[in-house]
């Protein structure tokens, strides 16, 4: 069930679902596993907000266990492609692709709340079928792993060798540890201004 918000104006009452109301404040919420449907929605929202105002920041709140690498990369590439800075804010958990998207936010605008958790690891594989197909899938997994590690090294400033070592197994971090690692830039408790969008 998605809550609705009622707004009063001179023209009368208007009802919004909560996510549409947040979108008016340039807030996008990723609160599920990352799949193609969710990625398409988030990409569309980012493109819409860019068309509305290419100069104003977009705020991507993340509470996600991760999900599809391909779907996540569609979101990531759009974040880098559009003109507005995308500020990423971790609430709850940003794991796997969720952590990757968190790190991919605009430098200086990657945030976690104090009791959030961040987890990085290598991509998961599940190859089945004939040996030749498994070989193709194994090569693809290695390509994805190397790509993600290189991008994490870029966004965190960590050496590639350390990223490879630290993502070999599930690696959970507190916000303070994630800040020290370079995945985020700030740990905040309260927004500096009352506006929903004032977290930059």
UniProtKB/Swiss-Prot annotation:
Gene3D superfamilies: 2-enoyl-CoA Hydratase, Chain A, domain 1 (3.90.226.10). The active site is at residues 96, 121. InterPro entries: ClpP, ClpP/crotonase-like_dom_sf, ClpP/TepA, ClpP_His_AS, ClpP_Ser_AS. SUPFAM superfamilies: ClpP/crotonase. PROSITE patterns: CLP_PROTEASE_HIS, CLP_PROTEASE_SER. Its EC number is 3.4.21.92. Keywords: Cytoplasm, Hydrolase, Protease, Serine protease. Disulfide bonds: none annotated. GO terms for cellular component: cytoplasm; endopeptidase Clp complex. It catalyses: Hydrolysis of proteins to small peptides in the presence of ATP and magnesium. alpha-casein is the usual test substrate. In the absence of ATP, only oligopeptides shorter than five residues are hydrolyzed (such as succinyl-Leu-Tyr-|-NHMec, and Leu-Tyr-Leu-|-Tyr-Trp, in which cleavage of the -Tyr-|-Leu- and -Tyr-|-Trp bonds also occurs). One of its GO terms (biological process) is protein quality control for misfolded or incompletely synthesized proteins. Fourteen ClpP subunits assemble into 2 heptameric rings which stack back to back to give a disk-like structure with a central cavity, resembling the structure of eukaryotic proteasomes. Belongs to the peptidase S14 family. NCBIfam families: clpP (TIGR00493), PRK00277.1 (NF001368), PRK12553.1 (NF009205). Cleaves peptides in various proteins in a process that requires ATP hydrolysis. Has a chymotrypsin-like activity. Plays a major role in the degradation of misfolded proteins. This is ATP-dependent Clp protease proteolytic subunit 2. It comes from Synechococcus sp. (strain JA-3-3Ab) (Cyanobacteria bacterium Yellowstone A-Prime). The gene is clpP2.
């Amino acid at each position: 069930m998605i809550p609705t918000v009622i707004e009063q104006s001179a023209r009368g009452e208007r009802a919004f679902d909560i996510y549409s109301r947040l979108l008016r404040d340039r807030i996008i919420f990723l609160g599920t596993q990352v799949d193609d449907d969710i990625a398409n929605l988030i990409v569309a929202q980012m493109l819409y907000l860019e068309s509305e105002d290419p100069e104003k920041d977009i705020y991507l709140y993340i509470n996600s266990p991760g999900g599809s690498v391909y779907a996540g990369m569609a979101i990531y590439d759009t974040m880098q492609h559009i003109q507005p800075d995308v500020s990423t804010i971790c609430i709850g958990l940003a794991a796997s692709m969720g952590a990757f998207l968190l790190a991919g936010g605009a430098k200086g605008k990657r945030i976690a709340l104090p009791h959030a958790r961040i987890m990085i690891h290598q991509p998961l594989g599940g190859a089945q079928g004939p040996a030749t197909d498994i070989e193709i899938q194994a090569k693809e997994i290695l390509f994805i792993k190397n790509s993600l590690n290189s991008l994490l090294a870029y966004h965190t400033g960590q050496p590639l060798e350390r990223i490879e070592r630290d993502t070999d197994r599930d690696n959970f971090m507190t916000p303070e540890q994630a800040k020290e690692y370079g995945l985020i830039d700030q740990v905040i408790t309260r927004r500096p201004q009352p506006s929903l969008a004032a977290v930059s």
